[in-house]
Curated annotation (Swiss-Prot):
3'-phosphoadenylyl sulfate binds at residues 40-45, 116-124. The lineage of its organism: Bacteria, Bacillati, Actinomycetota, Actinomycetes, Mycobacteriales. It is an enzyme of class 2 (transferase). This is Glycolipid sulfotransferase MT1418. SUPFAM superfamilies: P-loop containing nucleoside triphosphate hydrolases. InterPro entries: P-loop_NTPase, Sulfotransferase_dom.
Length: 326
């Protein structure tokens, strides 16, 4: 374990549907891969890329969310999730939405961290919320988490339906984490800009650690085959440019959508109205329809309150904006 980041230094991140203390139940192995990203920032895309490298092809031994579970998510008993991971003989790769300061940093483990323009992530989260079966999520959560351990009732009623514009205003102005003892506040709706930039910031200050690597949604869009070579190098997996080009065809959004029941998260849990809609469009710039000129100005003022210029350049444009290797 990296002595610079012992277990006692972790921030506790407990929200309505996730608890990073669940990681304490898992014994990490030499060669494990942990993939961390804010919601709707390319985590599933990255899982697919890593799966293509680990299995050297498109076939999986089961649904991706079983092979590579979101360990923190409180809709499956942690004993069941750990038993599945302990039984795996291949190189393990595990999903989390926990910021890096909420994880144990282990020198034997590779940490693959992913970013996306926060505005695009928020739009994608807005559509994902509409695709989610909240009643099913509530049933699963309450079956796993004892009443006295629940942070708050999941999916509490907002009192009135909010427009996308209202959602985005709340997202932009939401509180800065972490409050004492808890990493994220009890959020409603699509979360907050502050949470996204906080999570990316926990990676940014650790990006020069030898086992931490940053990837970006925009870079995937620009050159998917080229980006597939980057995790191959980070993870020590041999792959030629030609092989990466062959494998990348299975990680396009169209290809993943065509196998949504296998690739989308939680498909075996029945939480989506449509598995295919999880891979909605995957584009950039849809946020512009929700932002007035005044909100554009407020957004730029807000992000400069929350993060330094180099991180903001990378967060919005990937390596074209700023190379995190610098």
């Amino acid at each position: 374990m990296n002595s610079e980041h012992p277990m006692t230094d972790r921030v506790v991140y407990r929200s309505l549907m996730a608890d990073n203390l669940r990681w304490d139940a898992l014994q990490l192995r030499d060669g494990d891969i942990i993939i961390s990203a804010p919601s709707k920032s390319g985590l599933t895309w990255t899982q697919r890329l890593v799966s293509l490298l680990v299995f050297d092809g498109p076939d999986l031994p089961g649904p991706l969310s079983t092979v590579s579970p979101w360990l923190d998510q409180t809709i499956r008993p942690i004993e069941e999730v750990v038993a599945t991971l302990d039984a795996q003989q291949h190189r393990r790769f595990i999903k989390t939405h926990t910021p890096l300061d909420g994880l144990v940093l282990d020198d034997r483990v590779s940490y693959i961290c992913v970013g996306r323009d926060p505005r695009d992530a928020a739009v994608s989260m807005l559509y994902q919320s509409a695709n989610m079966n909240e009643d099913r999520m509530r049933i699963l959560h309450e079956a796993v988490v004892p009443f006295h351990e629940r942070i708050a009732p999941p999916f509490a009623e907002l009192g009135h339906a909010r427009s996308p514009t209202e959602e985005f205003r709340d997202w932009m102005e939401g509180p800065n984490p972490p409050p004492p003892g808890i990493g994220f506040t009890h959020l409603k709706g699509i979360g907050t800009l502050a949470n996204i930039l906080h999570q990316l910031g926990t990676v940014w200050v650790r990006r020069h650690l030898p086992n931490v690597a940053l990837f970006h949604y925009a870079d995937y869009q620009a050159d998917l085959a080229g980006e597939l070579l980057r995790p191959a190098r980070v993870l020590g997996i041999a792959a030629t440019r030609d092989r990466a080009r062959d494998l990348a065809q299975y990680a396009t959004l169209d290809a993943m959508r065509s196998r949504a029941s296998e690739i989308a998260p939680n498909t075996t849990d029945g939480i989506w109205h449509s598995d295919e809609r999880f891979f909605r469009r995957g584009g950039s710039g849809d946020w512009q329809q929700f932002f007035t000129e005044a909100e554009h100005l407020r957004y730029y003022h807000r992000i400069n309150q929350l993060a330094p210029p180099d991180l903001l350049a990378w967060a919005h444009e990937g390596r074209r904006g700023y190379d995190p290797a610098n």
